[in-house]
Amino acid sequence: MMSKYVTTTKGLSHFMLFLLRLLALALFIYSVSLVFTSNFNMGNLLVWLLTAAVDVYAIWQQPIHHWLHGTIPGKIVFVFLLVFGILYAALLGFVAFSGYANPATGQEKVVIVLGAGLRKDRPSLLLRYRLDKAYEYAVAHPDALVITTGGQGRDEWVPEGQAMRNYLIEKGLDSQRVLAECKSTSTEENFLFAKEILVQQGISAQEPVVYVTNAFHCYRGGVYAAMAGFTTAHALPAGIPLRSVLTCYLREAAAVIYYWLFKSSRTGFMQPLVGLLSLNKKFFYK
């Protein structure tokens, strides 16, 4: 048995093993930091699961390597993980590049800013990236109306839409130009309820609009805008903090899969689970 272990571990050089353990340590430190720097969400959960898998493999590499390559069940699992990893990586690439596939034209007179979570009553760093991008557009287009969207999460002191509106006004936008939507709990509802506000303002959903979100989120933003009835919606992608790249892209890829399966964030197997666990819906697909 020992000879098998010695033989199978030769496939993983000392240098590669060092890199694996370095990656495991980095993921562990990053995972711990999320507890103190981010609200609990699906992205964090996926990172923790990834960290657990990498750390377990780094610690028990010998027996796991032997099982994956030396047994039939292990080989089946290995092939499954390999195919899954390749497909998920391809999906991550799709999410990354789709953010720039439908850019704003500069002719849009309505700006819809999608919510992204608060820290108490202030926009999170990720959300500030969106708001700053929306502010730049609003300053360059003084006749554009801005709608901030987002309801109040379980760990938030005020509705996102209100906190976002306050942020833009503090930066210098005229309060008459900024309207807050404060009921939505998902990207889909952001657009549905923003449309209601526009109708109240006498603006048709046929008018060109630009929605502001981070680049990774633009694909779903576009499809949900179309589902809500916006016929000409363009994306204005904002940047993303380096510390949020892994959590956001892992979560968004899962959210895209969910959309492809169920189309609507108001249906599907997640919906009763959300109610059962008393979790804000943004945990799964904000």
What do the PLM-derived regions correspond to, one by one?
Residues 1-108, 199-286:
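Extended hydrophobic blocks
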Residues 78, 90-250:
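A structural signal for short, hydrophobic/glycine-enriched beta-strand patches
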